[in-house]
């Protein structure tokens, strides 16, 4: 009788284990903006949808949008962990410290933070080499400007944004030694009203080609209304400004998300600092305007191909900062660690970094 009961119990346990093994992997996402921002958060959510399409019923995804950076983020990340998510992606720089705190409290959950630099056993980081796209954007802007004044809408003065401002200006200077750059800080990732105000402030100063590090298409729309030019951010924003739009630098998160989810399923996931870019198609140039001058299109393509192949790295010295100091020595290319710590403007930018 005891043996029979034991066998029944073992059978039940085996059945339960089989059911448990078939349960989908739970993956959570937290976004700083709305999924409809048609920029940064939108493309992360496209990556989430790409996961669902690839894995089908093997996974179950959850997302929370419009989460402010700070205490609210810690609360939402905690809720995602308590809800049984096996892997959580936190997709904004300001989610870094909240993610670190929650990861320590949930050692059996795996976390990945976008654009950050703090690692732990169960916490990895991932970032795009957006500076590659900014350099090409600068090349296009430097060739297209008629006023020799291009503009950049910054979000927050963090290394990623400062690095990209530098890359854009270096790209512009490589084709136009006389070009100047104006910078306006919106102090937001996503706020169409503030982004429009920033765009108009730049154009009022003589800027005729704009770049942005904010997430809505508002700057492009503003440029379209005034007959000027702009470059899209994070997603294909061409439909909002068919005449103003030069091209968009599109983020493609799907390959990375698939790779990391598969690693969790295979038991091979590990904490790492991952950088993706043109070389692995995590960055692409979207909807290049067909009406660009032939020489501009040729230079865009050539610069893209050189960066994608690794033949050219934008942050290769000698590079001086705007104080006259050597920021990057001759024949040295900034390492990923160094790229993550850029806190200086390149020579020629006359603005000061807000502190």
Question: How does the language model describe each region?
Answer:
Residues 22-355:
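A residue-level marker of the well-folded mature domains of exported/periplasmic proteins
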Residues 1-21:
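Gram-negative bacterial Sec-dependent N-terminal signal peptides
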């Amino acid at each position: 009788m005891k043996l029979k009961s034991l066998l029944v119990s073992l059978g039940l346990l085996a059945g339960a284990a089989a059911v448990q093994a078939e349960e989908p992997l739970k993956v959570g996402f937290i976004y700083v903006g709305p999924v409809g921002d048609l920029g940064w958060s939108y493309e992360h959510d496209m990556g989430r949808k790409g996961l669902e399409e690839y894995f089908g019923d093997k996974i179950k995804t959850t997302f929370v949008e419009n989460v402010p950076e700070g205490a609210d983020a810690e609360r939402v990340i905690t809720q995602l962990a308590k809800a049984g998510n096996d892997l959580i992606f936190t997709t904004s720089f300001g989610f870094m410290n909240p993610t670190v705190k929650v990861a320590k409290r949930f050692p059996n959950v795996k976390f990945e933070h976008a654009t950050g630099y703090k690692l732990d056993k169960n916490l990895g980081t991932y970032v795009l080499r957006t500076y590659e796209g900014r350099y090409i954007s600068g090349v296009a802007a430097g060739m297209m400007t008629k006023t020799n004044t291009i503009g950049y809408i910054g979000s927050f003065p963090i290394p990623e944004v400062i690095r990209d401002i530098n890359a854009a200006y270096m790209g512009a200077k490589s084709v136009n030694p006389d070009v100047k750059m104006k910078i306006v800080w919106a102090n937001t990732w996503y706020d169409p009203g503030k982004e429009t105000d920033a765009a108009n402030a730049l154009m009022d100063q003589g800027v005729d080609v704009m770049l942005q590090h904010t997430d809505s298409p508002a700057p492009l729309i503003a440029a379209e209304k005034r007959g000027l030019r702009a470059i899209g951010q994070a997603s294909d924003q061409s439909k909002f400004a068919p005449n103003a739009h030069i091209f968009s630098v599109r983020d493609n998160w799907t390959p990375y998300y698939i790779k990391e989810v598969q690693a969790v399923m295979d038991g091979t996931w590990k904490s790492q600092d991952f950088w993706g870019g043109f070389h692995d198609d995590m960055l692409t140039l979207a909807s290049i305007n067909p009406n660009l001058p032939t020489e501009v299109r040729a230079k865009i393509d050539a610069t893209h191909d050189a960066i994608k192949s690794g033949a050219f790295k934008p942050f290769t010295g000698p590079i001086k900062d705007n104080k006259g100091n050597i920021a990057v020595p001759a024949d040295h290319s900034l390492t990923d660690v160094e790229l993550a710590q850029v806190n200086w403007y390149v020579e020629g930018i006359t603005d000061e970094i807000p502190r």
